[in-house]
Amino acid sequence: MSGHSKFANIKHKKEKNDATKGKIFTRLGREIAVAVKEGGPDPNNNNKLKDIVAKAKANNMPNDTIDRSIKKAAGEGNAVNYEFVTYEGYGPSGTAIIVEALTDNKNRTAANVRNAFTKGNGSVGTQGCVSYMFDQKGQIIIDKEECDMASDDLMMLALDAGASDFNEEDDSFEVLTEPDDFSVVRETLEKAGVPMMQAEVTMIPQTWVELSDETDLKNINRTLDLLDEDDDVQQVYHNWDE
């Protein structure tokens, strides 16, 4: 298949900088709340919710915590209304950064995101200023040690289900799909007993930017760390070749 998409670098993974599982669960809880509001509380009738529940389980979120999040979101009175917002901007040496957030206060979130860019000598741009540099894809990462299926069999299973690409690294496999095909491919792998480290729709850079200047490296890490610390921020994508 085609060359790999550097999936180890696709996004600045918030999980690695989170001090506790609680922060991860809080972010997943917000995603659940939005999915329930948009499509109802039954995962069998709400593919977006079904995908998020699978993502939550992959992050070891307990079933009772998932159930409570769904029930809370389904209740009219106590549910917080979160709005999905996206910010695009530039880091050092023209690196492209996309920030996805779920917030109940857009003014607060916008100010925090702008501050994170400014502190790293970057800037927030207009909508569309960098998103054209990325492709939206469904992405599934599978740990080789956890997977009993042979590489060729796994590839054929994924491609037959509708995957657009299959890549193999030293310790993992990557399955890529078009966004509309993601749910079907994920469910097919799940039913076949394939363990998934990560399964979500993501943004994959078309090209990568290398940074060697110490000041640039310090600045981009500062921006990404500040975004990590913001509870409103759900995902951060960039094209820095870490």
UniProtKB/Swiss-Prot annotation:
Family annotation (Pfam families): TACO1_YebC_N, Transcrip_reg
Gene3D superfamilies per UniProt: 1.10.10.200, 3.30.70.980
Record bears the keyword Membrane: no
Biological process, per Gene Ontology: regulation of DNA-templated transcription
PANTHER family, per database record: TRANSCRIPTIONAL REGULATORY PROTEIN YEBC-RELATED (PTHR12532:SF6), TRANSLATIONAL ACTIVATOR OF CYTOCHROME C OXIDASE 1 (PTHR12532)
HAMAP family noted in UniProt: Transcrip_reg_TACO1
Protein name: Probable transcriptional regulatory protein Cphy_2507
